């Protein structure tokens, strides 16, 4: 990640909440700094590519067209993603939450952000909602 994005106070959450636990087996990796996706990567078919994509500082599309598309290429509109780590930690740092604060997150997505917040403030203090059943 970019220098300074992951501040020392967020390092414990980053280490305790691995991104790969919140990334499905079928993904369309993004390109760092760009809103474009590479081709589909399936963990069981290309594990090295999947792991490299998960731990690269880039967004990952996890769903297309509200789940209606499941083909080998790309759908029309990306509808769920796991955000770029530098973006996630920049936003969390700007939020300024501390242990004991209560957080309502709208848009759970893959759940990684909520898990990072839960590590920081306590799981009992985080409520997250998602309209997408997938």
For the regions a protein language model found, what residue spans apply to each?
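Class I SAM-dependent transferase core
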Residues: 1-104, 113, 119-120
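Conserved S-adenosyl-L-methionine
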Residues: 107
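Conserved SAM/SAH-binding loop
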Residues: 110
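Conserved SAM-binding motif I beta-strand of class I
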Residues: 125-130
């Amino acid at each position: 990640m970019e220098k300074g994005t992951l501040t020392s106070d967020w390092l414990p959450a980053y280490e305790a909440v691995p991104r790969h636990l919140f990334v499905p087996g079928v993904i369309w990796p993004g390109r760092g700094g760009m809103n474009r996706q590479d081709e589909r990567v399936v963990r069981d078919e290309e594990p090295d590519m999947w792991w490299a994509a998960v731990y690269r500082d880039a967004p990952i599309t996890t769903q297309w067209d509200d789940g209606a598309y499941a083909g080998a290429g790309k759908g029309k509109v990306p509808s769920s993603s796991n955000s770029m780590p530098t973006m996630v930690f920049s936003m969390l740092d700007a939020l300024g939450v501390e242990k004991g604060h209560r957080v309502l997150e709208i848009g759970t997505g893959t759940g990684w952000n909520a898990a990072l917040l839960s590590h920081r403030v306590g799981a009992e203090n985080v409520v997250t909602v998602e309209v997408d059943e997938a």
